[in-house]
């Protein structure tokens, strides 16, 4: 079964890269969307923008700020193994 990765809506390039690698990608529109995700990727523009870092999820949260889509994919892979 594909790992479920939650991402913020503005990260469309990351969404495409993760889907290409076989991940199940869901858009996080509210903190509840992070539940059940194996990993979450946030922009980092507004720290804890959706309350995701407030232990809504036990999954790793990756801040995408300053990273390319490929770097984010590598980080996701290393965090969910």
UniProtKB/Swiss-Prot annotation:
Transmembrane segments: none annotated. Signal peptide: none annotated. It comes from Bacillus subtilis (strain 168). Pfam families: UPF0180 (PF03698). Belongs to the UPF0180 family. The gene is ykuS. This is UPF0180 protein YkuS.
